[in-house]
Swiss-Prot record:
GO terms for molecular function: phosphatidylglycerol-prolipoprotein diacylglyceryl transferase activity. It is a multi-pass membrane protein. Its EC number is 2.5.1.145. This is Phosphatidylglycerol--prolipoprotein diacylglyceryl transferase. A 1,2-diacyl-sn-glycero-3-phospho-(1'-sn-glycerol) binds at R150. Pathway: Protein modification; lipoprotein biosynthesis (diacylglyceryl transfer).
Amino acid sequence: MIHWDQSRTLLSFPRVGLHLSWYGILFSLGIFLSSFSGIKLATALCKDREEKKELRTSLENFALGALLAIIIGARLAYVLFYGGSFYFENPSEIIKIWKGGLSSHGAVISVVIWAAVFSRLHIRKLPMLSVTYICDLCGAVFGCAALLIRVGNFMNQEILGTPTSMPWGVIFPNGGGQIPRHPVQLYEGLGYLVLSCILYRLCYRGVIRLGSGYSAAGALIGVAVIRFCAEFFKTHQGAWLGEENILTIGQWLSIPMIFLGVGIIWIASKKK
């Protein structure tokens, strides 16, 4: 068994009142690595030198906007689906994201919305920047961000797993007591990374064409399935559904993603 009681703070500068948390650093690093990978993939597949320069600049701008969209969307979704009545009674707490509380489903929705807005603003200059192209690119490179965010959850001792007798069980004293639990944060994060690496490789080799919709669809379905399965190893989350419910709020939110992914594949296949 592993006893995990790491401080949430990675670096602290008390004289200036600055405290850098593991979660914040890992979140930022994950977004940076995924953005870097996306720009690298897109420019590698672009053959025109001038177009490649414009594409790089445009995607860098997209990444900056996506970071803000993810934070806002993930926070609002958490407030709506997991916060119960707490945030309605204490609205000032909504902006306090440093206390924790982000929803991956909200992050997905916000990125898609931002992709649609960004595409509308830039598609005349770069016709390749369709909503489908941007979403395909995001689907192929989201893994680094997803993994490191879940590692941040692990460091924070949050999103705890169910009790286990397996040798890799982890004891989280801050919230989990002295009971060994599944490190479900790492299960889920590694699943996302593997899925993303597969999609990245398929796009890079030309098996999946960016803009076809298949990468985005594969990511939606894969993420939903991984999340759905991971929920069975998590302790109860959310205030709207009680523990007596067959499915968790995370599983209910994952089901539409599967249908959406299948729908995108069906539409894409009709265009061939």
